[in-house]
């Protein structure tokens, strides 16, 4: 299986063209075709020699993904189901924000974190995505717009799709560097957010990288007992260890951390739990921000339901009164398979039902 050309960082591309006996500037030309003109084949790179195009075709593919399903919401959200070269499926989501187009990318096939409310955790992790497969998601979103004559550019990236980004650390870091590169997509570092469920040692590593991207932490509970019951990762990295790493990150980078908090009715949404959360955040209040997220129900996790508006607002008001920075996050794609992993899960179920029907006509 040939790798995607998008797997190569710019410096690696320069090294590759030199190995082919070409001048270094050819790497700039290839990158311009890929990231500025967004071609989908090497043959479209008209200022390259036939010999170099043949070498590119022999060693790489441009885009390793196939578009399987697209769902468009009335609010402009678009959800994509892509097929990888090995037949596995991943999701990508485009959200229209007031500040631009934001794409949420997937980093793994399934997930090992063990969040009991998430459709992504229904199957254990099968593999990591490589850098090229993550970059390719954005390129196909851009292709989708180009085919419709829409001259819109992806401006923001959130690494919050299926999988734990810090469990695929090197590929995610390479991805961030690729999309941030001035010669590539040139997406500003502060327009990129990487999320983690709480791998404390990787948060420390990320602080030391010196990249200026944003960090989000999926918290979802204010104490160890509750967090361990809904997120098994907390058993390995309890809140004390997690917050020590977060404080190290803030001290090292002087950057704000966003906390994701999904609102589960009568599970984690009481006023008492809001007070616990405020206490947990008091030492980093000035450099923390809480996203209160309405829950998208998943049929496989019917023990959970969405918090009613009254409980969400009471939680919000309590945090605010304690000086916390928080917001109730806007919902996107409520009329499509909106929850993370839901489109993929539902598609796999339908494919399974078709197979059963074929076996038992």
Curated annotation (Swiss-Prot):
Ranges of residues in domain Radical SAM core: 97-329
**Cofactor(s) the record lists:** [4Fe-4S] cluster
Instruction: Report the locations given in the UniProt record.
Output: Cytoplasm
A GO molecular function held by the record: tRNA (adenine(37)-C2)-methyltransferase activity
Q: What does this protein do?
A: Specifically methylates position 2 of adenine 2503 in 23S rRNA and position 2 of adenine 37 in tRNAs.
Q: Which reaction does it catalyse?
A: adenosine(2503) in 23S rRNA + 2 reduced [2Fe-2S]-[ferredoxin] + 2 S-adenosyl-L-methionine = 2-methyladenosine(2503) in 23S rRNA + 5'-deoxyadenosine + L-methionine + 2 oxidized [2Fe-2S]-[ferredoxin] + S-adenosyl-L-homocysteine; adenosine(37) in tRNA + 2 reduced [2Fe-2S]-[ferredoxin] + 2 S-adenosyl-L-methionine = 2-methyladenosine(37) in tRNA + 5'-deoxyadenosine + L-methionine + 2 oxidized [2Fe-2S]-[ferredoxin] + S-adenosyl-L-homocysteine
Further details from the record: Reaction proceeds by a ping-pong mechanism involving intermediate methylation of a conserved cysteine residue.
Binding residues for [4Fe-4S] cluster: 111, 115, 118
State the NCBIfam families in the record.
Answer: rRNA_mod_RlmN
Q: Name one GO cellular component term.
A: cytoplasm
Write down how the cofactor binds this protein.
Answer: Binds 1 [4Fe-4S] cluster. The cluster is coordinated with 3 cysteines and an exchangeable S-adenosyl-L-methionine.
Q: Which positions form S-S bridges?
A: 104-340
What are the protein's UniProt keywords? 4Fe-4S, Cytoplasm, Disulfide bond, Iron, Iron-sulfur, Metal-binding, Methyltransferase, rRNA processing, S-adenosyl-L-methionine, Transferase, tRNA processing
Enzyme kind, highest EC tier: transferase
This protein's name? Probable dual-specificity RNA methyltransferase RlmN
Assigned EC number: 2.1.1.192
SUPFAM superfamilies, sorted: Radical SAM enzymes
Keyword Metal-binding applies:
yes
Q: Which family does it belong to?
A: Belongs to the radical SAM superfamily. RlmN family.
A GO biological-process term = tRNA methylation
Presence of keyword rRNA processing: yes
Q: Which organism is it from?
A: Streptococcus pneumoniae serotype 2 (strain D39 / NCTC 7466)
Q: Which CDD domains match?
A: Radical_SAM
């Amino acid at each position: 299986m040939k790798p995607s050309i998008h797997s190569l960082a710019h410096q690696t591309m320069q090294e590759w063209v030199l190995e082919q006996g070409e001048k270094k500037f050819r790497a700039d030309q290839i990158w311009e075709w890929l990231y500025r003109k967004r071609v989908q084949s090497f043959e479209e790179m008209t200022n390259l020699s036939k010999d170099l195009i043949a070498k590119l075709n022999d060693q790489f593919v441009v885009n390793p993904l196939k578009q399987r399903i697209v769902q468009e919401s009335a609010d402009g959200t678009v959800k994509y189901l892509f097929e990888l070269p090995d037949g596995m499926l991943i999701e990508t989501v485009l959200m229209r924000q007031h500040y631009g187009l934001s794409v949420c990318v997937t980093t793994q096939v399934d997930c090992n974190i063990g969040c009991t409310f998430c459709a992504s955790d229904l199957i254990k992790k099968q593999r990591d995505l490589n850098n090229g497969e993550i970059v390719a998601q954005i390129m196909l979103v851009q292709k989708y717009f180009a085919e419709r004559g829409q001259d819109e550019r992806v401006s923001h990236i959130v690494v919050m799709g299926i999988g734990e980004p810090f469990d695929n650390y090197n590929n995610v870091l390479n991805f961030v560097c690729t999309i941030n590169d001035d010669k590539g997509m040139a997406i500003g570092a502060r327009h990129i957010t990487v999320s983690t469920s709480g791998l404390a040692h990787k948060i420390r590593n990320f602080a030391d990288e010196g990249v200026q991207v944003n960090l989000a932490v999926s918290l979802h509970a204010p104490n160890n007992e509750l967090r361990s019951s809904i997120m098994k990762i907390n058993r390995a990295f309890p809140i004390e260890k997690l917050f020590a790493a977060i404080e190290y990150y803030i001290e090292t980078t002087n950057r704000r951390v966003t906390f994701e908090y999904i609102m589960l009715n009568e599970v984690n949404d009481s006023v008492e739990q809001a007070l616990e959360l405020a206490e947990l955040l008091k030492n980093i209040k000035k450099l923390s921000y809480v996203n209160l997220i309405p829950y998208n129900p998943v049929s496989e996790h019917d023990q959970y339901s969405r918090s009613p508006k009254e409980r969400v607002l009471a939680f919000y008001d309590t945090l605010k009164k304690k000086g916390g920075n928080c917001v109730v996050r806007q919902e996107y794609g409520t009329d499509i398979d909106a929850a993370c992993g839901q489109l993929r899960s539902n598609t796999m179920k339908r494919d399974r039902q078709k197979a059963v029907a074929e076996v038992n006509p």
